[in-house]
Amino acid sequence: MIFGAITNSWREQLPTHTVKELVGAAVEKGAKHIELRQTCLGECESGAGDDWRPNLDELQSVVEAYPSLTFDLAMALPCLTQTIDPVGDMFQAALAGAKLVGGAQPHLRVVDPAPVEGPWSSPSDIPEEALGLAGLATEAARQGVIMSMENSSLPIRNMAMLVEQVRSMVPEAAGAGLGLCPDPTNQLRRFPDSDPLAELDALPLDMIKLVHFKQ
C-alpha cells in the first residue's frame, strides 16, 4: 500500500505557504502520494464552483519538483444530483489537470457534496442524474483517465451498486476505469450504526482505486 496526504489537510497553512512547499514537507514525513484537492490548491487553482479551474502551469511546477511522487487530482462534482456535460469546460479542465499530474496513470477523484436520498435498496432507486456517470466515465476512459468517486452522503455499498450499474451501461474498458475512493469515516458520520469496514472489505479489488483514512 502506498501512503500519502491530501492537500485539504493543509487548509490553515495555505495562506502563508505554497503548495510546492507543503508537498515538500509531506515528502520529508514519508509521503509517497499526494491528492491535489480542489479548494486547497493555493497557487495551483483559480475560481470556485462551476468556474473552478486548475492552474496547469503551477501544477506542472509541483509535479516536476517531486518526480518520485505520484499524484491524483480531486474535485467536488455534483455528478449524483446533476447532469454534468462530459465535454463541458469544467470536466474537460479537470481531465486535463488529472492527465498533467497523473503521469502514466492519470486519476480524477470526484465527490458529490450535495445530500443524496438514501440508502438505496436496489438499482431501481438510483436517480437518473447519477446514471449520467456513464457519459463521464466514457469520456474519462477515452482520455486515459481513471475516475473514482468518494462516498459522501451514501454508504459504500450503495456507491458500489452505482458503479456496477454504470459499468453495465458502458464499454468494458470505460467500466474498468470507473471505481471508488471509499472513506469509512464519511459513512460513520451519516450512518453511525453501519459497518463501513465490512463494506470496504466486500468491494471487488478492481473497484477500489484509492482509500481515504482520517481521524
Language model feature labels by segment:
Residues A98-S122, Q143-S153:
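Active-site groove signature of glycoside hydrolases
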Residues D72-P78, P113-P115, L154-I156:
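Substrate-binding cleft and catalytic face of glycoside hydrolase catalytic domains
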Residues T18, G49-D57, V87-A93, S122-L133, ...:
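Charged helix-capping and loop-helix junction motifs
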Residues M1-K99, G103-A104, A141, A160, ...:
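N-terminal pre-domain/capping segments
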Residues Q38-E43, D112-E117, Q187-L188:
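Conserved radical SAM core fold
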Residues A5, R11, T16-H17, H33-I34, ...:
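Acidic/histidine-rich catalytic cores of soluble enzymes
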